[in-house]
């Protein structure tokens, strides 16, 4: 059957892929113009015109295109101006940014583009590097690559219409033949990453094989890490001269903006106290904006994000059209998405309630909305808390794995939770409902160990590539509070209660046998992953949150 060559129209008029720094965490009221006409007719027109002129200068500086007559057989793609106000950690506007974006969704795979994959650094990698900054008292600086995607070379022959408002006088009929990649093209991100990799490896940096956005350079007893997140570059170095030397080399190839010491990255505030040997990651300003958006800032602060005994189920979903219509007015999905970003970045203490609330996105009820507001009231009390790392005598990765039993009232499935610690703070965590119905607490705990074990292997492989944590050569220790699960992980014996366990979970035994991990028993009172699987008493929750490194700013900074 012949494949259709018809190009599907986008669902929305501005269905473009755009990488702007605040897109992940800026949840304030949308005031940015959505069209060229809105920008030039609005109260900030002079700012937006200046921003567009800066963008056009970047296009000229990078030799992104040349004006030509459109060849026969080619159809030019359109382009659109995208406007964004960049904000600081307090939400104040610091820059007006205009980005020229190609309508890449109209291009055909295999004709106009081929490979599109580009790596993206994980939050786990970022937190591990932050723990190392605290441990080794590293210099931590930040740089921004201006118009990063324009640095990528383009192999395909692509023509684009001239930008709105900037058509060349007397040559309005001509089109732009693209020499470089441009925002909006399917291959733009990949081409930028390839160019960046080519540049930094020529400077002697080695790419981490597990997270391809992390680079290491060792020069004698000195070392430096580079962390790339789209167009943001973090530099963590044991030597200030090596750091400045690297900055100079990068600035020779790319148009860079030196932001000095890192203090605000991807909506995360970085606070250091070098005399105390501590580093804290905070989302205070972000949480403030979340609370204001959902009108929670004046509510009574809560002690815990979910109370022990709280049950959230499908029984609390709307029962009729009247209730369903009422819930359509509630911004439930937006609230859960906002909480999810805080949870993923710096707040493992809300991982369990956010995971549970996310199960009802399709049809939430009023009880679910009340539970979501309870999480926000807890954040109201703890918004100035930080995920903290500190200098320790023995730097090693320690894991904790836990599970409840049949905690989901709808399908009787259990919830797994794990947290890995390094330098006194959590570097990796997860709370997730299991995909099977466990027949015993041992099986539920062993399945949870499987999730923790696979993450331990990832952490071990990644950290091995950093070459600064000697203890990673030893098996990663994972604590479990179920003796039967610990025994089962170390023995090949089966019983009537374990013979039906899926073979993939039995790979835990192989990891133990090969010396990649070791699973040891710990008392339930010391299981800090407990709040990732169920609601617990306030005193217990507070103790475990502190053990995960969730501390007040006063405790971190003094």
List each model region and its residues.
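RNase H-like nuclease fold core
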Residues: 99, 103-105, 339, 400-441
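Catalytic palm active-site di-aspartate
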Residues: 144-147, 177-185, 207-237, 250, ...
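Active-site palm subdomain of RNA-directed nucleic acid polymerases
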Residues: 195-230, 234, 243, 253-262, ...
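Catalytic palm subdomain of template-directed nucleic-acid polymerases
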Residues: 86-87, 150-162, 186-187, 217-254, ...
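RNase H-like nuclease module associated with reverse transcription
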Residues: 264, 269, 396, 426, ...
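Mobile genetic element proteins and their domesticated derivatives, centered on retroelements
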Residues: 6, 36, 52-55, 59, ...
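C-terminal reverse transcriptase regions that engage the nucleic-acid substrate
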Residues: 124, 130, 182, 187, ...
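Chromodomain-type histone methyl-lysine reader module
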Residues: 1-198, 202-209, 214, 556
